[in-house]
Amino acid sequence: MNKLTTLTLSLLLCFSCSKNEDVDTIDIPVTTTPRPIAQLLPNLSQLNLFEGPLKDLTPSPYSFTYTLNTPLFTDYAHKSRFIVLPEGETLTAVGNGMPEFPDNSIIVKSFYYNFDENDLSQGRKIIETRLLIKQNGTWIAGDYHWNEAQTEAVLENNAATVPVSFIDKNGTTVAVNYQIPSNLDCITCHSNNDQVKPLGPKLRSINYNNQLQNLINNNQITGISNISTITTLPNWEDDASYSLQDRARAYLDVNCASCHQPGGYCDVQTTLDFRYETLFENTSILEKKSEINSRMVNYQELFSMPLLGTTFVHTEGYFLIKSYLNTL
């Protein structure tokens, strides 16, 4: 919960009436919200990342929210995302990919489940809030685990399993043993050539619904002279606007390419390169299509792909990839 610093200004209004003097005092509260702290402190509430009750997940006014056109699948968990930049600093565009962040930037992502997708008034359960903080040119990762009362989240390095039950949009009750990753797990996916890096907010992934234009308008990003030169990663669910191939490649990029690319965790284990911009003939998708299918069709711990972040098959995602592989 954000701490509000309240300054009380007392205005003395003096009125003279005959020989009597009446003095009225008016208290006017002026509130200032403290800036977020770019450190991994023990409790999430200490970082000033949210204002109001912590469980509301209302971002600090010093931040900006963003969404991704094709997000990572994490056992149907919802995600709340925002970025905090240090005062007076901006992002710097680098092609269509990840922008350059100034030191003391914070990337915040909270994971939660609505108890009933058809009745949001039933509330939600927040599981974890992940942070990436840039300090002295290097990104550090931290994961805050939420308590049952939803009043605080505590910095943890170890993995944890959190049982969750929710009702999906079809009215079906779904039980999930949500896996909170360890700090080492986080680094596994976020590391490339032994350097921790952000994954989500690439320019091509936020270039829709005027998000990128709003960043330009708000002076939160520099280096874009013509927004039309920034490409857009396809929305894997939008079959009206994008081809099966483009949607499948986008899904593989977001869910698999962090490890399956040069310098990634699986670089020395396989020739697969799932980055969207990689030419098809250089991806090894055709040669490995049988293996790709076998790793996605059923969930087997330590065998299924993605290796981390899921505990069962993403039915809709698998159907997309299976349909795509059948065309090859």
Task: Name each model-derived stretch.
Residues 2-10:
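Sec-dependent signal peptide recognition
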Residues 13-16:
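C-terminal motif of bacterial Sec signal peptides marking the signal peptidase cleavage site
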Residues 9, 99, 109, 164-166:
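Short acidic-hydrophobic surface loop/beta-edge motif
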Residues 4, 36, 241-243:
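Generic hydrophobic alpha-helical membrane-segment signal
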Residues 18-26, 30, 117-328:
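Sequence context surrounding c-type heme c attachment/ligation sites in exported
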Residues 26-95, 101, 108, 112-115, ...:
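Conserved small-residue
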